[in-house]
Amino acid sequence: MKFETTKNKLHGNAYYQAQFQDPIKFTTGSATPASYNQFIDALRERLTGGLIYGIPVLRDPSTVEKPNQYVTVELSYSDTVSIQLGIDLTNAYVVAYRAGSESFFFRNAPASASTYLFTGTQQYSLPFDGNYDDLEKWAHQSRQRISLGLEALRQGIKFLRSGASDDEEIARTLIVIIQMVAEAARFRYVSKLVVISLSNRAAFQPDPSMLSLENTWEPLSRAVQHTVQDTFPQNVTLINVRQERVVVSSLSHPSVSALALMLFVCNPLNATQSPLLIRSVVEQSKICSSHYEPTVRIGGRDGLCVDVSDNAYNNGNPIILWKCKDQLEVNQLWTLKSDKTIRSKGKCLTTYGYAPGNYVMIYDCSSAVAEATYWDIWDNGTIINPKSGLVLSAESSSMGGTLTVQKNDYRMRQGWRTGNDTSPFVTSIAGFFKLCMEAHGNSMWLDVCDITKEEQQWAVYPDGSIRPVQNTNNCLTCEEHKQGATIVMMGCSNAWASQRWVFKSDGTIYNLYDDMVMDVKSSDPSLKQIILWPYTGNANQMWATLF
């Protein structure tokens, strides 16, 4: 069913710039993994309004003028057959598409969409909204049963360009296009699955992880922007490929690196922000609430938890590492207060002094030296005492070892993750094109991704270590602290800086101490070498967790 909408005549430079900005183009006829990556990167760049905690974020709707609210994407089947999509840059939603001299708008498209998109065409309203619930109802198929891939995209472009009025097929086709364009722009996980599909020349269906990410984009964006001391005020629950729950409680959780674009929710008061978020925009934007004081566990070395020794709260009792208990118990629960104290049962995590090696204890907050009770939790998993510049460290590898403060060397023993689920995050790690990290004895290299292979399963611990599920006593380790050092498997017992990694929002796996990233040597997987190398942004340094 088609309904012609009202077409408005527009004037002004703002309209001209928005309407006639070149569309971002992707040609399916000669598509390669590289050309698809270039397309998605260009779309992400066009949609990005700034960075919050280093993660690209869309524009604040309150700062966007209506004529500048939309971007266009051109998808080509051939030199003569193509369609265009209209995308709302405040939420990355597809709101309309153009097929020749006609254009079609979702029923729930913003009122301004038909005013500023495809104005030289005959405009029609589709009989359904652009959300998955409505699209699946009209398609008579769920997303998980609709195949994605290059051929599905090509046939979808050809079908929409034909002008056929089969609403069921239109809805099904739009489900394909929305996921391969908009969702891929939002999530590295999705774009990586498409790249693997292009490499294999094989169709794929959305897995539980992909669907889970699509369904939780807004809650995950909200949680990141409301982060307090690296901790989400509310957990976000994802589903992995094995249909298991993955509880995400902190900004440093590796699954957060799947986010390539966030929905704008609010500006964190103290977040590191990009210059793109200019002062006048930030001043107009909504500021996140800062009243959250989450109560969480703190997981660290070897997956053990920060614990008040013997559950004794007398002043001076040491803080130790202990096995995380099956139930949430008070001596392993810590409230992250807005005054920068970290409290268990109302008493403060306190450093005995400001020299390396001083032990950390529980102490009455009102009688302790205030500066000894203050801590900052960074988004790389570091917990630092601002007065001394020293960091919380687990020097002993044994359960029951007393925590101390030490010089910040970004060692594995100095890595932490907050949240009530501090268990290791189990995932495959996809890298250069269609290949995944695979463990072999003391070595690691890339092979064709197969989530059923145990060699491709990795456990990412709260301390920042990456361990093969086959043997979690081994850690991915750079052999030397220098450019070109090979990354191998070594025992985790030393908890070195060479064994601590951060999954960054730019798609890299980053070593904090060396300020370098994992790199497929010479972009040649046949060499079977992953090395440490300065950041270049090239495809051989891009990784994604496939959990």
From Swiss-Prot:
<feature type="disulfide bond">
    <location>
        <begin position="305"/>
        <end position="324"/>
    </location>
</feature>
<dbReference type="Pfam" id="PF00652">
    <property type="entry name" value="Ricin_B_lectin"/>
</dbReference>
<keyword id="KW-0430">Lectin</keyword>
<dbReference type="GO" id="GO:0006952">
    <property type="term" value="P:defense response"/>
</dbReference>
<feature type="disulfide bond" description="Interchain (between A and B chains)">
    <location>
        <begin position="266"/>
        <end position="288"/>
    </location>
</feature>
<dbReference type="InterPro" id="IPR016138">
    <property type="entry name" value="Ribosome_inactivat_prot_sub1"/>
</dbReference>
<dbReference type="InterPro" id="IPR016139">
    <property type="entry name" value="Ribosome_inactivat_prot_sub2"/>
</dbReference>
<feature type="disulfide bond">
    <location>
        <begin position="348"/>
        <end position="365"/>
    </location>
</feature>
<dbReference type="GO" id="GO:0030246">
    <property type="term" value="F:carbohydrate binding"/>
</dbReference>
<feature type="modified residue" description="Pyrrolidone carboxylic acid">
    <location>
        <position position="21"/>
    </location>
</feature>
<keyword id="KW-0652">Protein synthesis inhibitor</keyword>
<keyword id="KW-0378">Hydrolase</keyword>
<dbReference type="InterPro" id="IPR017988">
    <property type="entry name" value="Ribosome_inactivat_prot_CS"/>
</dbReference>
<dbReference type="GO" id="GO:0030598">
    <property type="term" value="F:rRNA N-glycosylase activity"/>
</dbReference>
<keyword id="KW-0677">Repeat</keyword>
<dbReference type="Pfam" id="PF00161">
    <property type="entry name" value="RIP"/>
</dbReference>
<feature type="propeptide" description="Linker peptide">
    <location>
        <begin position="279"/>
        <end position="280"/>
    </location>
</feature>
<feature type="repeat" description="1-alpha">
    <location>
        <begin position="302"/>
        <end position="344"/>
    </location>
</feature>
<feature type="repeat" description="2-alpha">
    <location>
        <begin position="433"/>
        <end position="468"/>
    </location>
</feature>
<dbReference type="InterPro" id="IPR035992">
    <property type="entry name" value="Ricin_B-like_lectins"/>
</dbReference>
<feature type="domain" description="Ricin B-type lectin 1">
    <location>
        <begin position="292"/>
        <end position="419"/>
    </location>
</feature>
<dbReference type="GO" id="GO:0007157">
    <property type="term" value="P:heterophilic cell-cell adhesion via plasma membrane cell adhesion molecules"/>
</dbReference>
<keyword id="KW-1015">Disulfide bond</keyword>
<feature type="glycosylation site" description="N-linked (GlcNAc...) asparagine">
    <location>
        <position position="420"/>
    </location>
</feature>
<dbReference type="InterPro" id="IPR036041">
    <property type="entry name" value="Ribosome-inact_prot_sf"/>
</dbReference>
<feature type="glycosylation site" description="N-linked (GlcNAc...) asparagine">
    <location>
        <position position="380"/>
    </location>
</feature>
<feature type="repeat" description="1-beta">
    <location>
        <begin position="345"/>
        <end position="385"/>
    </location>
</feature>
<feature type="repeat" description="2-gamma">
    <location>
        <begin position="514"/>
        <end position="547"/>
    </location>
</feature>
<comment type="subunit">
    <text>Heterotetramer of two A and two B chains.</text>
</comment>
<dbReference type="InterPro" id="IPR000772">
    <property type="entry name" value="Ricin_B_lectin"/>
</dbReference>
<keyword id="KW-0873">Pyrrolidone carboxylic acid</keyword>
<protein>
    <recommendedName>
        <fullName>Agglutinin-1</fullName>
        <ecNumber>3.2.2.22</ecNumber>
    </recommendedName>
</protein>
<feature type="active site">
    <location>
        <position position="183"/>
    </location>
</feature>
<comment type="function">
    <text>The B chain is a galactose-specific lectin that facilitates the binding to the cell membrane that precedes endocytosis.</text>
</comment>
<feature type="disulfide bond">
    <location>
        <begin position="475"/>
        <end position="492"/>
    </location>
</feature>
<keyword id="KW-0732">Signal</keyword>
<keyword id="KW-0611">Plant defense</keyword>
<feature type="disulfide bond">
    <location>
        <begin position="436"/>
        <end position="449"/>
    </location>
</feature>
<dbReference type="GO" id="GO:0017148">
    <property type="term" value="P:negative regulation of translation"/>
</dbReference>
<dbReference type="GO" id="GO:0090729">
    <property type="term" value="F:toxin activity"/>
</dbReference>
<feature type="repeat" description="1-gamma">
    <location>
        <begin position="388"/>
        <end position="420"/>
    </location>
</feature>
<feature type="signal peptide">
    <location>
        <begin position="1"/>
        <end position="20"/>
    </location>
</feature>
